[in-house]
């Protein structure tokens, strides 16, 4: 019974979402919605006045996104020499050889970085005891099995210095990767440093750092290239030997693994936990070495491939992106808009047959797939609903312009340009 109730609730929720969403053509031409694609798609494309109507829709949309009721009145424009000098000094744009201003696309780069960060996983792996003394073993989580591009990898080690013996001595800490090679295939390359080869084992210097031994603190050792090499070879474990030759004479020591809890025996012969030992163990464990890995899937990974939206070429009727560029010079707006030179007012148009509704890659694919499942089977209230061709990916746009007070404004506008279209 609870399962049936849950299904009914989800069904009703989807129906409410669809009923509350505007359908193409439900908005008046005079409105300036936040979605320029929706406004342009409802306008006639073939009539004699179609182009002016579309340009007017774009104008209203730009003013709306800049929170302006009308275009600024630039009666006394700033001299071009002063304008170009200010732009150079403030680093808000670049001036080309032809005198045109190219705005710095900081927001576009930030959007790309944010998208990249969303695809990046961060994995922290704590060290285990290695097979030999002063060696550490790191086993990279299975979470990283699909990750093949290393953005950053670091080994963190804690250097402990006794309070009574703090000198100004500097010590050198080295990390060596222990490697196993098949018999007769030992080829370390130019960057390898062999130290005490024994049979099939060899060592490669991973990282080296000179640190101050005056205080107890963490030290970071970059190992990105080594982890990248491991992933390229299909491996997931790293064995590291730690060397610090001057540590003993300076009184410093590296915390490689937490000490095991000591057991004390009471008068009755029973074992009891030593409170001091427990605190010491907890402190040691808090300084346990770890590997921090930031990695992502490669561009050609099958899980990263998603269906790209179609570009309208006049040959297909299926939902696609229609390119539409409005030059600010052509519409007489280049006197108050400094940069860019125009606006890519792309919009979505085309049919959405049932077999492509809710395609992967669409931000609306969950709801559209559920609704389409019931619609195709004639279930009420979805039987008469139709899929719509809507933007599925938008990108931001930066603008540099004058306001009514001749001030230069730079504004970053989110979701301004349609990049891809899909069926809802």
From Swiss-Prot:
The keyword Repeat does not apply. InterPro entries: Cystine-knot_cytokine (IPR029034), Inhibin_betaA (IPR000491), TGF-b_C (IPR001839), TGF-b_propeptide (IPR001111), TGF-beta-rel (IPR015615), TGFb_CS (IPR017948). One of its GO terms (cellular component) is extracellular space. Glycans are attached at residue 165. Residues 264-306 are annotated as: Disordered. Residues 264-275 have a biased composition (Basic and acidic residues). It comes from the Eukaryota. PROSITE patterns: TGF_BETA_1 (PS00250), TGF_BETA_2 (PS51362). GO terms for biological process: activin receptor signaling pathway; androgen metabolic process; androst-4-ene-3,17-dione biosynthetic process; autophagy; cardiac fibroblast cell development; cellular response to angiotensin; cellular response to cholesterol; cellular response to follicle-stimulating hormone stimulus. SUPFAM superfamilies: Cystine-knot cytokines (SSF57501). Belongs to the TGF-beta family. This is Inhibin beta A chain. It comes from Rattus norvegicus (Rat).
